[in-house]
Amino acid sequence: MIVLPNKVRIFINDRMKKDIYLGISNFGFENDIDEILGIAHLLEHLLISFDSTNFLANASTSRSYMSFWCKSINSATESDAIRTLVSWFFSNGKLKDNFSLSSIRFHIKELENEYYFRNEVFHCMDILTFLSGGDLYNGGRIDMIDNLNIVRDMLVNRMQRISGSNIVIFVKRLGPGTLDFFKQTFGSLPSCPEIIPSSIPVSTNGKIVMTPAPFYTVMVRINPTLDNILGILYLYETYHLIDYETIGNQLYLTVSFIDETEYESFLRGEAILQISQCQSINMNYSDDYMMNIYLNFPWLSHDLYDYITRINDDSKSILISLTNEIYTSIINRDIIVIYPNFSKAMCNTRDTQQHQIVVLDATNDGLIKKPYRSIPLMKRLTSNEIFIRYGDASLMDMITLSLSKQDISLKRNAEGIRVKHSFSADDIQAIMESDSFLKYSRSKPAAMYQYIFLSFFASGNSIDDILTNRDSTLEFSKRTKSKILFGRNTRYDITAKSSFVCGIVRGKSLDKTSLVEMMWDLKKKGLIYSMEFTNLLSKNTFYLFTFTIYTDEVYDYLNNNKLFSAKCLVVSTKGDVENFSSLKKDVVIRF
C-alpha cells in the first residue's frame, strides 16, 4: 500500500481485470438523508463519461461509498484508462465543480429509468437507510427536475466533501509517471474535507421488517473492530448466506436462513451458528469485495494481506469472541430482522415514495438465554459451472438467485445461460425449493419478459406456447440454425405488466461494440438505464431488451438507426391485463 501525504491509499493489484479502480468512502447515498435523496447517485451519473469504443467502464453508488473503474480495449492503453478515469474528477488540474443544467436534466431522466428498472426486476428495499431517516429507495426520482438550481448547488457542495482520506485507488500496474500523475490530481486534495456533513442518524434496532425477500435474514449489530472484520472475512470465505452491512459507524453481520424454523431458533436465542474452523483462509476475494472492505472501514491502516497470518493463526479466538458478541446482540435485541412478506394488502408504514412495508418491534417474548443447539451453515465449495437452456424449468429461479447473490455470475448466449457458483447441488436444491425463495422468484415477473421474448425470437415456438409454459419457457434445439425473415412491419404493440422495448435487429456491420455505444447514447439522452443484448445464431443478428418509461422515444431511436438493415421490435405498454395478440398476426420468423 502506498499512502500519499494527504492520506490517499494506492494499491497495486495485478490480478484485477480493470486497469484502474477508484473508491470514495463516506460518499454514498446515506449522505442524502435530510437533503434531496438521489444527489449522490446523480453525481455518479454526471461524473462518468468515456468513449465506449476504447474503454469499458462503470460506476456505482452504495449506501456508504461510491466507486468507479475503467479498462482499456482495442487501441487504448492502460495509461489512457487511468487518465480517462481521473478526467471524470479533474478538469485543467482542478476538481470539477460545474455541471450544466441540461446535463443534470438528462441524467435525472436516466435516474427515473433506473428506478423503474430496479423496481421491475428487483425489490429495492434499503432497510437500514429507511430506519435511519431515508427512504426504501434512495437513488433519485424524476421530481428532482423541479429543483434544478438547488440540485446543482448540492452537487457542487458534495464535490467539495471529497478528501484524500476518502480515496482508495487500485491500479493494475503503476507505470512510469503514474504515481506522479496521482500526486498531481488526487494527491492535491485536502486531507480532510472542506465541507464536513452532519452526522448520519443512527438506525433503530430491535425491529422486524416485513418486506419481499428471498431469505429470512437477521442483521446483528457488532462492534466495528479489526478482529470482528477479520471474523467476517473468515465467515464470508467459508460459508454462503453470511455477509455484512454498514451505515455510518455501525456494523451489522447479516445471517440469512432458508428454513423458517432455524431462523426462529436463532432469533429466540435457543440456537447458535455452527462455525467450524477450515484449513486456511486465502483471502482470494474479488477486487470489488476488497475495495468494499477498504471503503467501509477507511481506518484500516494496512493492506488486508498483512492480516492473513493473524486471521489463520488466531481464528479460534477471533471466532469465539465474534460468536459471543452475536449472541449478546440477539439477547439484547440489538438486531434488525427481515422477514419475507409478499402481501400487498398488509401495510402499516409507507416511505415517501409509497412503497409499502411492515415494521414491528422485536420483543423479548420467548427468549431463551442459554442456547442448546447449533445451526449448520452452507459451506462454499470450489467454483462450479453449469449451463441452463432457455427451455429448462429452473431458468428463472437461477436468474432470481443470481440477482439476489453477488457471487453468482451469468453469461448468456443464443441457446441459454452459463452460471458460475460455489454451492453444492444439495444446497442449490434446498434454496430453489424453499417457500420464501419460490415466492420471491414469482413476485417480480418482469425479469421473465426478457426471456419470454428471447425464446420467441430464437425458437420456432408460438407466443401462445411460450405463454402457456411461461414458468419454464420452451426448449429449442441448438442444432437448429434459425433463418429470420423480417416482414414489412417493424413495430408490434403489446400490453404487459412492465414497460419495455425488445426485438431483433440485423446489420452488416452490427456488433457488440456498436450496440454498447448505442446503449450509452440512449443513457446520455435519459431514455434508458441499461440495454441487454444477445447474439443470435443468425449472422449479424442480435436480440435487444430494455426496460424504459419512454417506449416511443426508444422505438423511434432504434427504428431510425442506420446500423440496422432489418428490425422487428416489440413495444410494451404497462397494463393490468396482458395482451400479446399482435404477435399472432404477421411476425415472420422461419427456420
Swiss-Prot record:
GO cellular component labels: virion component
Keywords: Hydrolase, Late protein, Metal-binding, Metalloprotease, Protease, Virion, Zinc
GO MF annotation terms: metalloendopeptidase activity; zinc ion binding
SS bonds (residue pairs): none
Note accompanying the cofactor annotation: Binds 1 zinc ion.
Pfam families: Peptidase_M44
EC code(s) of this entry: 3.4.24.-
Chief place where the protein resides: virion
Top-rank EC class of the record's enzyme: hydrolase
Top-rank taxon, per record: Viruses
Active site residues per record: 44
Keyword Transport: no
CC cofactor: Zn(2+)
Gene Ontology terms: biological process: proteolysis; viral life cycle
Entry's family note: Belongs to the peptidase M44 family.
Protein name: Metalloendopeptidase OPG085
Originating organism: Monkeypox virus
Gene giving rise to this polypeptide: OPG085
